[in-house]
Design a protein with these regions (language model features):
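C-terminal outer-membrane/trafficking sorting elements
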Residues: 276-356
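Conserved catalytic region of serine esterases and O-acyltransferases that act on ester linkages
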Residues: 194, 201, 205, 211-272
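Extracytoplasmic/secreted proteins, especially bacterial periplasmic and envelope-associated proteins
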Residues: 27, 37-44, 73, 104-111, ...
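Bacterial Sec-dependent N-terminal signal peptides
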Residues: 1-21, 275
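Conserved SGNH/GDSL esterase-like catalytic core that processes O-acyl groups on lipids
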Residues: 22-26, 32-115, 121
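Ser/Thr-glycine-rich phosphate-binding loops at phosphate-binding pockets of nucleotides
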Residues: 30-31, 203
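Alpha-helical cap/lid subdomain in secreted, periplasmic
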Residues: 77-200, 216
Length: 356
């Protein structure tokens, strides 16, 4: 399955590579997002590649995901809809709390992700993986040791990495692995200064890493071709772009980038279907709708055998069967609710039905 996903991502990248794209992104974070105006820096990177990023940002200093989950401003921006991506970034220390104290982080992320998917069925959630502080977190070491093993960059960064990967998997979301590239640069190019004097916030070079790390998954293009270097020297910018190519672009699946595209495409298609009026198309007819027990499908052309997929309202694949011509599907064991029928590998073939 992973090999198939990699091949599909390679094909998609090839198809979009020469195309100019426009994306709309909402950034919800704090000063790690706001410093150096990261969204505008990403937009500048995109412009240098012939692409366009339209963006909005809500990033008050010190904000947690919990703060965004109860903020009328953040919620209103999510509900305005039509975002291709909503990027979520938590306060850096929140991702290094003991396991017993992570509930609020996970529940806030789940709530925000649910709001995003409800109001942006054609969009995706992406988490902004940040980095460990330059010399670790001595305060959390004092408070939480011995669980907090050591006040080092390495320990803090490993926790942040682990938690962002877990939270993205929990929510079928993508990750922009800024912290992973940050780690690579620290190990292999220590001469590039990534931090401000506070040993926490990003320098211009640190924000440039983030900009390239976001451009790459948002547009699925090779960052080495980016011509915008901000105020960095050509050598520094090239080193960073090479690192992003190695860590991110060459390993998109590792960061969940693209692996939920099929789920999102079903949710997007379903948002544009009306259960009362869109009961058939040139590839598929379906009746009755609503349905109680047996759903009848007619697949065209009748001689073609296809994979018929049934998804629940959240985009989770719950059944896949092979069929051609007329098929009668027993759905009595399904819970009452909204479902979607999709013909695999047939673009724009998705219908909504109600089980009652």
């Amino acid at each position: 399955m992973k090999i198939i996903t990699v091949l599909l991502l390679t094909l998609v990248s090839a198809l979009v590579y020469g195309q100019n794209q426009t994306k709309r992104a909402l950034f919800l974070g704090n000063s790690y997002t706001g410093v150096n105006n990261l969204p505008q820096m990403i937009a500048n990177v995109a412009t240098s590649m012939g692409d366009t990023l339209e963006w909005e940002m809500e990033a008050p200093g010190g904000y947690y995901l919990y703060d965004h989950s109860i903020s009328t401003t953040s919620i209103s921006k999510i509900e305005s809809g039509n975002w291709d991506y909503v990027i979520l970034q938590d306060q850096s220390q929140a991702m290094t709390l003991p396991n017993t104290q992570m509930y609020l982080v996970y529940s806030s992320a789940k709530l925000l992700d649910s709001l995003i998917k409800e109001n942006n069925p054609c969009g995706e959630t992406m988490f902004y993986m940040t980095w460990g502080r330059e010399n670790g977190d001595s305060l959390f070491y004092q408070i939480y040791s011995p669980w907090y093993a050591e006040p080092s960059y390495e320990f803090m960064d490993s926790l942040i990495h682990e938690r962002y990967m877990q939270i993205s998997t929990n929510n079928n979301a993508e990750v922009s692995p800024v912290g992973a590239v940050w780690n690579y640069i620290r190990q292999n190019h220590p001469g590039i200064g990534l931090y401000q004097a506070d040993e926490s916030h990003p320098s211009v070079a640190g924000s440039y890493i983030a900009a390239c790390c976001f451009y790459t998954p948002l547009f699925r293009k090779d960052p080495r071709l980016v011509s915008f270097n901000s105020s960095l020297s050509l050598a520094e910018a090239s080193t960073i772009k090479d690192a992003v190519k190695l860590v991110v672009y060459d390993s998109l699946v590792k960061w969940n980038i693209g692996i939920y595209d099929s789920i999102n495409s079903v949710a997007c298609a379903s948002a544009n279907l009306n259960v009362n009026s869109e009961r058939q198309n040139s590839n598929l007819q379906m009746f009755p709708n609503p349905v109680t027990d047996i759903l009848t499908l007619k697949v065209y052309p009748e001689k073609d055998s296809v994979q018929i997929q049934i998804y629940d309202w959240s985009g989770v694949l719950i059944r896949e069967i092979e069929g051609a011509g007329t098929r009668r599907i027993d759905i009595r064991e399904l819970a009452n609710g909204v479902y979607f029928i999709r013909l695999k590998n047939r673009s724009n073939t998705a219908l909504k039905f109600v089980k009652n």
